[in-house]
Amino acid sequence: MTAVTPDDLTISPRRIEFELPDPLPRYWHGGDPFKTHFFNAMSLLFPDGERFFIDSVRYFRDRVKDPRQQQLIKGFIGQEGHHSREHIEYNRRLEAQGYDVTALTEPVRRRIRYANAHFSPERRLAA
């Protein structure tokens, strides 16, 4: 496989931490219910989606011989792993507000399980 990664690309894991007020206001995004629920929904999707992407990349990691590509893979996995942990914590806060997080995330998990069972590693990586 030929790499087409730009020479100047680097992925440095950023340790972004959400600075959430405690308690988290119901409509935390400027008091706007729409914006709040939009970002809540995104946060609910991210941990499982990020894990899917990490697993898809990790499957091929040992086949990559280029040290630079290996560093990019390591950076990607580190970045997504940290990002996912932040969303998991945020989602716990939503659960504390009374949201049924499992009911909202289970359909995504079912689709990911289906993709893992029915799609080749190459196809999952292409996602």
Predicted stretch roles:
Residues T2-A127:
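Non-heme di-metal
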